[in-house]
Amino acid sequence: MARVTVQDAVEKVGNRFDLVLIAARRARQMQTGGKDSLVPEENDKPTVIALREIEEGLITKDVLDARERQEQQEQEAAELAAVSSIAHTR
């Protein structure tokens, strides 16, 4: 199990409050969204994995925002395609 120091992660993000928000978002993605870890899991909990990803510079607020925007666009496109196919069958 790798040791994570919060100070190292804070230096990547800027302040501890943003660190908490970003780490919580990422941990939630891994727990409920089925997102894969970007670092070896090593039997760590999602919160520790999220902090390790932030510490290594793999996850930032901008990265999370971009991923969520992309997923939202893909979902909207799928919904539009479904509605379009229903409209064409009528």
Swiss-Prot record:
A GO cellular-component term linked to this record: DNA-directed RNA polymerase complex
Biological processes per GO annotation: DNA-templated transcription
Residue ranges of coiled coil: none
Domain of life: Bacteria
Keywords on record: DNA-directed RNA polymerase, Nucleotidyltransferase, Transcription, Transferase
Subunit field text: The RNAP catalytic core consists of 2 alpha, 1 beta, 1 beta' and 1 omega subunit. When a sigma factor is associated with the core the holoenzyme is formed, which can initiate transcription.
Protein name, per record: DNA-directed RNA polymerase subunit omega
Organism expressing this protein natively: Vibrio atlanticus (strain LGP32) (Vibrio splendidus (strain Mel32))
Taxonomic classification: Bacteria, Pseudomonadati, Pseudomonadota, Gammaproteobacteria, Vibrionales
